[in-house]
Amino acid sequence: HGQKLSRDLTESFKFAQSQQTSRPGNFVLKIRYTGLLDITHLNKHGIEFVSQEDNHLCVVFVDETGMTVFEDHLQRLGLDETELTYKQILEAIEGIDNWTSDDRKSWALRRHGLPRSEKFLLDVELWPVAVAHHPERLSTCDAFERWLAHNGIRRTDKVNLDSLVMYRLEVNSSQANLLLNHSDVRLVDLPPKSGIRYSQLNCDINRIPEGIQ
């Protein structure tokens, strides 16, 4: 079991290194597991829980140091003489994979594809690191916004809540594909046809602008 997971990790790490990033040295992995996974102690194995995506699927962050720890612990899994703290966490893991461009496509994007116009808007959700005004969240957003500027992508709107970080971006098809392969991006979606702005999501029901259906 440990050897299979080690092979999964090696392949996933290579793929993760090829993805776009605004925070060099930080990677995203997709972990499949059975039973209960003690997410509060994943850091004992060098990885940081980010998001629960399904009943038995979660996403974690890992840096190069954590990757070394994780790989070492997986290789020691199953060796009778080895004492591993929180060994049950590793035993619950069924597979290690990547969050790919297909994972990042919303239902609407998979159904309709990218718009055919030269420039178009996309709603791009980042992984919800920490909470809204936590230094780690602010650092992640700053790095992503620098990456946007470097790649000539214009931001038209942004929402930053404890459980949601989302940008509305003006892109061309090449820039859209960069976003679909960006490690900090959880989901890429087509904006609602109403054209509603994020700021309107928090307005009083009696003050909703005309024309929104």
Task: Give, region by region, the residue ranges found by the protein language model.
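Autoinhibitory N-terminal propeptides
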Residues: 1-150, 155, 159-161, 182-211
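Aromatic/histidine-rich interaction motifs
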Residues: 159-172
